[in-house]
Amino acid sequence: MAERDLNEYLAKIAKAKVNRRSFLAASGLLGGSAALAACTSGSGNSAAPSAAASAGGAPSTPAPASAAPSAAAIENELFIYNWSDYIAPENISAFEAMHNTTITYDIFANNEELLAKLQGGASGYDLACPTAEFLVPMVEEGFIEKLDQSRLPNMKHIDPALLGQKWDPNNEYHVPKDYGTTGILVRKKVVTEPVTSWREFYDLAVGKYSGRVVMVDSLGDVLIMPLKMLGYSLNETDPAKLDESRKILTDLAPHILALDSDTYQDKLASEEAVLCLGWTGPLLELRENPETADTEYVVPSEGTLFWLDTWVKLADAPHPNAAYEWLNWIHDPEVQAKETEFNGYATPNLEAKKLVSQALLDDPAIFPPDDVIASLEGADPAVTDDEGRLALWADFKSAIG
């Protein structure tokens, strides 16, 4: 993504009023055999982190030291609440070995679940990875703390185009993690018809490939499809336009295999599902396997969502020094490049980008070209708690079962 185009795009979406919350999802990633052993507890676990676990395997190359190690003692535990399989296992292993620290990695399926868990009194976590627009309600509700920038020298590597945005205008509360889009994954050896738009996705889902369609479990991503099919903004709240979207989703619901943010790549690999509304994360693993190398990722012609995921330090984090050390170390360029190679999402770290393979840099699914950038739309934080959208989502989920 050219810096000029990213600046222009972010300037455009930053004009949206920021006052409540919006959903921009990013998950999926590598599944099955590549899943982190550190993920010892799932999205439905108790409020506090569970027993500590670590990812197996040593890093293939020596991990670089943190650019500015904290003078304070680094605690021997670190609790992370994150999307599934969203950290390179070798980086977890390296951090644990460097600091004799055990990382516990609990997962959530979407931003709504993360926020609800914190609202329900969850405590004991040090770090979490909300999508950018969720910074606003998390700050308002006191769930995250301002960061001491003197302890984060590696922030100098972050693309300035991603900083100073409405969700955190003074860059006080977050460290950018990854960015990407929401689109369609297609098993082309099964689906021979063209899939270039949300309309074509819908027609195939309710027709020939009924029952073999999976969608990520996230309101803000799923609503993109009917709204863009109808020519509306993905932030639409007008009741009449939402009713039009409701009709589309009501007709679609009987044909959906599952709402699944964590293992949809496994369903694609087995051909249980051959169409998916999701993210680019699983694409690398699927393409590397000869049996699933036919998997393609499509940014629909009607347009779709741009999202940015972030690192935040939670209020009253029990292991603050380990948290700061992680936040800085993860953006050492060598470490960050391993993240991109593992998870298949675009890095905001300009120096790390120089170390990423040319194949990834040239992949339009991961680093979108200019024409795709022009079609993207950011989510308005004001719409997430819109009652009409929430009711529509609840009805759709109930219809799927």
Residue locations for each model-derived region?
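Bacterial lipoprotein signal-peptidase II cleavage site
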Residues: T40-P49
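Early extracytoplasmic/lumenal segment of secretory-pathway proteins
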Residues: A67, A71-P137
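Extracytoplasmic ligand-binding site segments that recognize negatively charged/polar headgroups
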Residues: Y81, Y86-P89, A128-E272
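Conserved C-terminal helix/tail region of periplasmic/extracytoplasmic solute-binding proteins
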Residues: D266, D370-G401
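N-terminal secretory signal peptides
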Residues: M1-V18, L29-L36
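A bilobed periplasmic-binding-protein/Venus flytrap-type ligand-binding module shared by bacterial periplasmic
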Residues: L185-V190, K228-G231, W307-A322, L327, ...
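Periplasmic-binding protein-like
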Residues: L242-D251, L257, E291-A315
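Mature extracytoplasmic/periplasmic domains
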Residues: L314-A374
